């Protein structure tokens, strides 16, 4: 009996230690603005927060050999060839892909191999490619991600722009979460540095708003049942909006 009590105590201590190893930062509790919810004191407050930075695989490198910049392909199967370095986790057997691509600000698409083909129709494409950790969150160190513009068929290149833009790993469009689950907003900023370029990311989940000044997953707790528009926008710290087509992403999320 004493052994059982000791083991239970040990498990509790270890669980507490693990939870304490991740410290919440930038926590923001948001009051309800909707009349139907504002008067319900029993509802827990919607809370945005992040965990302290703990960058995984900072030495992992993702290289893109094909397509080349502004390369033109015929409609149909377009080849992609990546080279992945210092990321042994990619070679492990898993049911979850470690390499993801986002085409023109759409939902992420996972791949198990660094060499593959993708069926694409005529158009101009910007692909953001990145590696993810064991939890499916994008790696955010320099070299963990890469982007490239290319064309399929009779299409024109994107107008030149030196503006940074955003790629949204999570959530995916029409993602459904159970009541009590946290909404994870995981993004990458490409073509710029949030500190050096004085950038911030503004997040709006319906009427609930939050801002961050660095790349780290944002967690939203205590969302009530309903449908939510998740608007993630990259902008200057002085409030000036960027003009590029991929500076903002909108997804629909359901809490059931």
Question: How should each PLM-predicted stretch be described?
Answer:
Residues 73-80, 85, 177-186:
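Short coil/turn motif common to extracellular beta-sandwich-like domains
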Residues 19-21:
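Bacterial signal peptide processing site
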Residues 118-124, 220-229:
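Surface-exposed, short loops/turns at beta-strand junctions within beta-sandwich domains
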Residues 105-113, 207-215:
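Short beta-strand segments within Ig-like beta-sandwich modules, predominantly Fibronectin type-III
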Residues 14-17:
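C-terminal motif of bacterial Sec signal peptides marking the signal peptidase cleavage site
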Residues 26-72, 153-176:
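Short, compositionally biased P/S/T/A/G/V-rich stretches that sit at domain boundaries
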Residues 132-141, 210, 235-243:
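Short acidic/polar inter-strand loop motif in beta-rich domains
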């Amino acid at each position: 009996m004493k052994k059982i009590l000791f083991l239970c105590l040990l498990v509790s201590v270890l669980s507490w230690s693990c939870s304490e190893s991740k410290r919440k930062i930038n926590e923001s509790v948001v009051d309800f603005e909707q009349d139907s919810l504002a008067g319900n004191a029993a509802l827990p407050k919607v809370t945005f927060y992040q965990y302290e930075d703990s960058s995984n695989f900072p030495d992992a490198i993702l290289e893109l050999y094909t397509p080349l910049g502004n390369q033109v392909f015929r409609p149909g199967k377009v080849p992609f060839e990546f080279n992945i370095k210092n990321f042994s986790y990619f070679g492990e057997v898993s049911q979850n892909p470690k390499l993801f691509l986002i085409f023109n600000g759409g939902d992420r698409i996972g791949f198990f191999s660094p060499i593959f083909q993708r069926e694409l129709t005529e158009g101009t494409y910007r692909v953001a490619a990145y590696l993810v950790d064991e939890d499916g969150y994008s790696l955010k160190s320099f070299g963990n991600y890469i982007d490239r513009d290319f064309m399929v068929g009779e299409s024109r290149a994107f107008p030149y722009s030196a503006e940074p833009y955003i790629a949204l790993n999570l959530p995916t469009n029409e993602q459904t979460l159970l009541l009590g689950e946290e909404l994870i907003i995981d993004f990458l900023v490409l073509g710029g540095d949030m500190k050096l370029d004085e950038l911030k990311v503004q997040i709006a989940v319906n009427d609930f708003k939050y801002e961050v000044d660095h790349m780290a997953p944002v967690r939203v707790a205590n969302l009530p049942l309903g449908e939510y528009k998740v608007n993630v926008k990259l902008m200057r710290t002085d409030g000036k909006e960027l003009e590029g087509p991929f500076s903002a992403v909108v997804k629909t999320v359901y809490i059931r």
